[in-house]
From Swiss-Prot:
Protein name: Collagen alpha-2(I) chain
Family of the protein in this entry: Belongs to the fibrillar collagen family.
Subunit: Trimers of one alpha 2(I) and two alpha 1(I) chains. Interacts (via C-terminus) with TMEM131 (via PapD-L domain); the interaction is direct and is involved in assembly and TRAPPIII ER-to-Golgi transport complex-dependent secretion of collagen.
Remarks, miscellaneous: These protein fragments were extracted from an ancient femur bone collected in Roseburgh, Oregon, USA.
Purpose of the protein: Type I collagen is a member of group I collagen (fibrillar forming collagen).
């Protein structure tokens, strides 16, 4: 029936099983388990287990995709999807330029007014058509494309460290050196648990053998299927500590899910209590010796040391005696750390075994001959995790892996060079209304405008100047106007003189950092290379060039728009520039041509000045007339009072660029403001890196040879070094090949069938491997149509495809005979002609057009908005502390005499200057200087240029249609019979399909289906161990205890 056989587990005790008048109350001692029998027939599913829930197993490897199954029967209509989000409003198109006014067409000849024809007779009602043939059922639909892989789940909790295994039975020998890691072995199949063997007697104390090198690390085995949890069994005998099991194959990583919206970070939790340190387990059996790694390349020489002080030349002393060998010189410069290798994968946490009793140490025996090689023991429980190995060399770069989850935003880096200018983007929507700006200065008086056309009425006498009205209230802001028509290009004005450079403002605060770029796909793990010897550390080389920019990752699905970020702090306002002097008023432009005035009417007598009436309602705006020539400039009005600053209107669309104005006269330079205070000194920058070593200096004079010193005293052995922190967990290596299948066990005897238990539905196990393709089932009968669901909201419209080509036009029908026109009479209209014949019968309708060729795909949709960055993952748990290293052997070498004093080294060159520190913050804004006095009046400016002609006026309204001219109208001819229907037109081609719309919202989860039929009975379990009880009688019945 597939999967593993769990019939060897002990069955749960029955409440009260009756067997021939006897009752069994309790289990006896557990006997030895016999050899495993062959698997029996599948028995009925057993009752619900009573054990605690086991730890979740590792995810199994995703099986290969099965063959495509046959098309199933048509499914039921799914529930209506959730309403889609409303689409974004389309961008507003740019208003096109005004079209040129067309020429008036030639007026047509007035046609004759025809006589109204008679109404046609009503057609006969057709008989109802025969019912259509019932269509055959449609073919079953194909399976849809598989959905996207869900987001990768969070990593599971780290397994607990297993308890130490039972104590070994060997004598206490010293631990030998750990050999290098061997090659990775192939993964074996998951073995069945063996029966616990009898407890062996304590053997004689053997001699301590040499510690072998560490064995090869096993490959990762296939993850086993989690079986049902059985009842707790009796504690068995203490087993031997087994070798470390192979790690399982890593599960296939799912495709990255869509990044969710960024959540609000919660408060930082309190630090948890430090857990108790686990006991170090017994070391496992030694493996075969691995191959030695290659020797690393020696590092380059370190930088030259500082020169020593120049010693005085001493007197030559007597030649001393030949001294004994000197002590070992100081160690050389420590080499740089070798390239970091990929650390091995963590093995799965073992089951916590019972702590074995410590055996008593036997007396130290006489060293005997080397014993025979023992057989490998049964694999036992997993030992404690070993110390981390030495870092290996960096493996070759792997292939690109799937895109990882986006990291958190990093700190803003240094400002890079300016990139190339990007392409112009689409016109964005108007931004939010900004704060009201400072009130602007009063502008200079503009040039006189062009005079409008003179009114049609007679020109009246000028009225008396009215009383100046009061200040009006501020009106509400009007709606934003549409973009105006582009005006004609003006003539280019003269280039003005460059203005004087203003005082640079203070540096503003740096703006917020830009969004972080998308992370490229991660590379696959490279193979672990052999660990090389650590070379001596060379000098730091110059920084290498920047690497190539990674290619952008795959564009993810459009994420939902996140909330608007808070705006950055506004930069400090720069110091005000020196105000320029007011330029001279230019001369009045040339007076335009005076329009032709109409004839003056009779001048009326001036009336009395009436009281100002109420303001009338604003009338409809008439159409703009053609612009007339420029009139004379009117007198300058009195300056009005300055109104209050109104609210800022919405941003309008940018109009066309106007013609360049004339440059104003150069103003005089104002007085210089007081000097601002110095800003706060910025923090000191980081110390620069050490410079390259300088050239060797000249050799100093030779020093005298000193006397031989007394022999040194042997030092004490050094203390054991502290264990360094464990390295971070490495990337899991590639899965190894699957191992060979194990031998089939013996078949067990058939057990009695237990009662059928009705347990609750357990948690779903890991997905099994895809089964073979089943036979194609017959299509089921279609179910009744479901009730229509509520109307869903319209989805976002897809991009329209290209329009299909138009079908060919059908041949025109034959025109009916036209009646002859009557003679053109001269007298009164003739009598009305007789009505035409009965209209002809309509022809049969043509056949439906054939489907056209499929259109090409529409253009691709635009990229969606980038999703929010994911939050940073939680920090991993710290690794276990490694065991302390053994103390080194004590030195025995003889004590040497003092060596000769070395000559002073050459003087090193000075290192490069360190990098500049960051710019200090801007100092406080200086006090504003006094306002400069007005400059002298400048020379008179040049006369202004003649204004441009006004824009062409809009075309006037069309005139009314003229009356028909005189002339007699002839009688209408008789109506001809209806012509026959034309042949049916050809089939039009099918239009192009639109582009695929966005994926709909995931439908609601379906309800649970009915329970399936009961499975076949499982294989019977082995007979239970003998209880070992005794029988006793009570009230005529026998009981067993």
């Amino acid at each position: 029936s597939g999967g593993f056989d769990f019939s060897f587990l002990p069955q749960p005790p029955q409440e009260k099983a009756h067997d021939g008048g006897r009752y069994y109350l309790g289990p006896g001692p557990m006997g030895l388990m016999g050899p495993r029998g062959p698997p029996g027939a599948s028995g009925a599913p057993g009752p619900q287990g009573f054990g605690p829930a086991g730890e979740p197993g590792e995810p199994g490897q995703t099986g290969p995709a099965g063959a495509r199954g046959p098309a199933g029967p048509p499914g039921k209509a799914g529930e209506d999807g959730h309403p889609g989000k409303p689409g974004r409003p389309g961008e507003r198109g740019v208003v096109g330029p005004q079209g040129a006014r067309g020429f008036p067409g030639t007026p047509g000849l007035p046609g004759f007014k025809g006589i109204r024809g008679h109404n046609g007779l009503d057609g006969l009602k057709g008989q109802p058509g025969a019912p259509g043939v019932k269509g055959e059922p449609g073919a079953p639909g194909e399976n849809g494309t598989p959905g996207q892989t869900g987001a990768r789940g969070l990593p599971g909790e780290r397994g607990r460290v297993g308890a130490p295994g039972p104590a070994g039975r060997g004598s206490d020998g010293s631990v030998g050196p750990v050999g290098p890691a061997g090659p990775i072995g192939s993964a074996g199949p998951p073995g069945f648990p063996g029966a616990p063997g009898p407890k062996g007697e304590l053997g004689p104390v053997g001699n301590t053998g040499p510690s072998g090198p560490a064995g090869p690390r096993g490959e990762q085995g296939l993850p086993g299927v989690s079986g049902p949890v059985g009842p707790p069994g009796n504690p068995g005998a203490n087993g031997l500590t087994g070798a470390k099991g192979a790690a399982g194959l890593p599960g296939v990583a799912g495709a990255p899910g869509l990044p969710g919206p960024r959540g609000i970070p919660g408060p930082v939790g309190a630090s948890g209590a430090t857990g108790a340190r686990g006991l170090v387990g017994e070391p496992g059996p030694a493996g075969s010796k691995g191959e030695s790694g290659g020797k690393g390349e020696p590092g380059s020489a370190g930088p030259q040391g500082p020169p020593g002080s120049s010693g005085e030349e001493g007197k030559r002393g007597p030649s001393g005696e030949s001294g004994s060998t000197g002590p070992t010189g100081p160690p050389g410069l420590r080499g740089g750390p070798g390239s970091r290798g990929l650390p091995g994968a963590d093995g799965r946490a073992g089951v916590i075994g019972p702590a074995g009793a410590r055996g008593a140490s036997g007396p130290a025996g006489v060293r005997g001959p080397s014993g025979d090689t023992g057989r490998p023991g049964e694999p036992g429980l997993m030992g404690a995790r070993g110390l981390p190995g030495s870092p290996g060399n960096v493996g070759p770069a792997g292939k690109e892996g799937p895109a990882g989850l986006p990291g958190i935003d990093g700190r803003p880096g240094p400002i890079g060079p300016a990139g190339a200018r990007g392409e112009a983007g689409n016109i964005g929507f108007p931004g939010p209304k900004g704060p009201a700006g400072d009130p602007g200065k009063a502008g200079e008086k503009g040039h006189a405008g062009l005079a409008g056309n003179r009114g049609a009425g007679a020109q009246g006498p000028p009225g008396l100047q009215g009383v100046q009205g009061g200040k009006g209230e501020q009106g509400p802001a009007g709606p934003p106007g549409f973009q105006g028509l582009p005006g004609p290009a003006g003539t280019t004005g003269e280039v003005g003189k460059p203005g004087e450079r203003g005082i640079p403002g203070e540096f503003g605060l740096p703006g917020p950092a830009g969004p972080r770029g998308e992370r490229g796909p991660s590379g696959e793990s490279g193979a672990v290379g052999p660990s090389g010897a650590i070379g001596s550390r060379g000098p730091s080389g110059p920084p290498g060039p920047d690497g190539n920019k990674g290619e952008p990752g795959v564009v993810g699905a459009p994420g939902t728009a996140g909330p608007a970020g808070s705006g950055g702090l506004p930069g400090e306002r720069g110091a005000a520039g020196i105000p320029g002097g007011k330029g001279e008023k230019g001369e009045t432009g040339l007076r335009g041509e005076v329009g032709t005035t109409g004839r003056d009417g009779a001048r009326g007598a001036p009336g009395a000045v009436g009281a100002p009436g109420p303001a009338g309602a604003t009338g409809d705006r008439g159409e703009a007339g053609a612009a007339g020539p420029a009139g004379p400039a009117g007198p300058r009005g009195s300056p009005g009072e300055r109104g209050e600053v109104g609210p800022a209107g919405p941003n309008g669309f940018a109009g066309p660029a106007g013609a360049a104005g004339q440059p104003g006269a150069k103003g005089e330079r104002g007085t210089k403001g007081p000097k601002g205070e110095n800003g706060i000194v910025g923090p000191t920058g980081p110390v620069g890196s050490a410079g390259p070593a300088g050239p060797n200096g000249p050799a100093g004079p030779a020093g005298s040879r000193g006397d031989g010193g007394p022999p040194g005293v042997t030092g004490f052995p050094g203390a054991a070094g502290r264990t360094g922190p464990p390295g971070p967990s490495g990337i899991t290596g590639p899965p190894g090949p699957p191992g060979a299948a194990g031998k089939e066990g013996l078949r067990g005897p058939r057990g009695d069938q237990g009662p059928v238990g009705r347990g609750e539905t357990g948690a779903g196990g890991p997905p099994g491997f895809t089964g073979e393709k089943g036979p194609s089932g017959e299509p089921g009968t279609a179910g009744p149509p479901g009730t229509a669901g509520p109307q869903g909201l319209l989805g976002a419209p897809g991009i329209l495809g290209l329009p299909g080509s138009r079908g060919e036009r059908g041949l025109p029908g034959v025109a009916g005979a036209v009646g002859e026109p009557g003679p053109l009479g001269i007298g009164p209209p003739g009598a009305r002609g007789p009505s035409g014949g009965v209209p002809g019968v309509n022809g049969a309708p043509g056949e439906a057009g054939r489907d056209g060729n499929p259109g090409s795909d529409g253009p691709p949709g635009r990229d969606g908005l980038p999703g929010h960055k994911g939050e940073r993952g939680y920090a991993g748990n710290p690794g276990p502390v490694g065991a302390a290293g053994a103390p080194g052997p004590q030195g025995v070498g003889p004590v040497g005499k003092h060596g000769n004093r070395g000559e002073p080294g050459p003087v090193g060159s000075a290192g490069p200057v360190g990098a500049l520190g960051p710019r200090g913050p801007s100092g406080p804004q200086g006090i504003r200087g006094d306002k400069g006095e007005a400059g002298d009046k400048g020379p008179r400016g040049l006369p202004g240029l003649k204004g441009h002609n006004g824009l062409q006026g809009l075309p006037g309204l069309a005139g009314q249609h003229g009356d028909q001219g005189p002339g007699p109208v002839g009688p209408a001819g008789p109506r001809g019979p209806a012509g026959p229907s034309g042949p049916p037109g050809k089939d039009g081609r099918t239009g192009h399909p639109g582009a695929v719309g966005p994926a709909g919202i995931r439908g609601s989860q379906g309800s649970q289906g009915p329970s399936g039929p009961a499975g076949p009975p499982g294989p019977p379990g082995p007979p239970g161990a003998s209880g070992g009880g005794y029988d006793f009688g009570y009230e005529g019945d026998f009981y067993r205890a």
